[in-house]
Structures are given as C-alpha cells and as structure tokens.
C-alpha cells in the first residue's frame, strides 16, 4: 500500500501454476432434482521458495442441492463445503460447511417464500477475529469464510399480470 488510504494492485512478479478439475452432475427423477459439484484446485506460487499454495484458494470445494419442484411448490436444501485455505502469512484456516433451505409456494398472483441461509451459523468470527487493532486504527485480516453467519429471509415474488405458464416439465404436472 502507498498510504493508509491508497493501495496498488499488481500482477504476480512471476508465474503461478494452476491445475484442477471440476465436475457437475445433475440427477432428475419426477419432481426431484439433485445437483452435485466438486472442484479440486491446486494453485501454486512458482516464484516463492517451496512453491506454496496460493492464499485464499481452497484445494477442495463441494456442493449439493436437492430440489423438489412442481406447479405448486419449490423446496430446496443445499450443502456447501469449503476446504482448508492458507492465508498470506502461511497460516492454515479451518474448513467449513454451510447449509441452506428454501420453501416457496406458487400462486397465480405470486410466490411467498421463506429462506434460511447458513443456518449452521458458520462464520469467520467463530474461528478468528475479523477486525484487529484499535477503533482509530483498525486492521482487517483476510476474509476466508462467511462474515454474515445465519441469514433468514421472508419475501414475496409478486406477478402483477398473473402467473405465466412455464414450459419446463416441472410445472406441467
């Protein structure tokens, strides 16, 4: 950084090697859909002695969403896993899992819903401080996990002109 209020971002001085693989799978049975994904990421800083892993890049990420949907309802349950990461100082973080649930009822006029995100309340503040230093001179460590924790929302998607017929087979039953 140039000063406490100005920063310069620049490219890495030499090569970064990134290898990996990602897979996404979808299973469907009647009104059920199950999505699974996994990513393996091996990104190394070739210009640093020992070729350490790139900071804030988890080697393993996975997710799963199970969705039930028909013309009247949409219900979804999700699980996401983020593997351990390294911070810029070489410290290894905790891995974590987040869970979510969505329930939505469809009507001609719209769709009320209730949504629970990260209902296991996984957040960085449970593992390490999010702010260091003093009130007048705060220091913000790297962010590697959710900062919000549990989020609960209730809402309505309003369709002022009525519900449009969907051509998707999940709504035709």
Task: Kindly give the residue locations of the regions a language model identified.
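C-terminal beta-signal and adjacent terminal beta-strands/loops
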Residues: 105-173
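Short, basic/aromatic-rich helical patch in the C-terminal catalytic core of site-specific tyrosine
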Residues: 23, 101-103
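Short, well-ordered turn and helix-capping elements at secondary-structure junctions
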Residues: 81-85, 100, 107
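Transmembrane beta-barrel architecture of outer membranes
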Residues: 18, 59-63, 96-100, 149-151
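Surface-exposed extracellular loop regions of Gram-negative outer-membrane beta-barrel proteins
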Residues: 1-12, 78-90, 121-139, 143
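Strand-loop-strand
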Residues: 95-96, 108
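Aromatic-acidic/polar surface patches that form glycan- and anion
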Residues: 14, 55, 92, 145-146
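Gram-negative outer-membrane beta-barrel transporters
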Residues: 3-87, 157-159, 166, 170
């Amino acid at each position: 950084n140039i000063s406490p209020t100005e920063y310069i971002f620049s490219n890495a001085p030499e090569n970064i090697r990134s290898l990996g693989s990602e897979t996404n799978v979808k299973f469907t049975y009647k009104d059920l859909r199950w999505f699974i994904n996994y990513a393996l990421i091996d990104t190394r800083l070739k210009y640093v002695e020992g070729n350490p892993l790139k900071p804030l890049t988890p080697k393993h990420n996975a997710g799963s969403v199970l969705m039930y949907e028909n013309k009247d309802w949409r219900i979804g349950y999700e699980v996401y896993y983020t593997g351990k990461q390294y911070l810029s100082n070489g410290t290894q973080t905790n891995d974590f899992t987040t869970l979510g649930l969505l329930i939505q009822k469809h009507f001609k006029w719209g769709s009320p819903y209730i949504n629970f995100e990260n209902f296991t309340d996984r957040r960085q503040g449970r593992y390490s401080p999010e702010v260091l230093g003093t009130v007048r001179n705060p220091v913000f460590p790297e962010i590697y996990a959710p900062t919000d924790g549990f989020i609960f929302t209730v809402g309505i998607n309003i369709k002022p002109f009525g519900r449009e017929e969907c051509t998707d087979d999940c709504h035709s039953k």
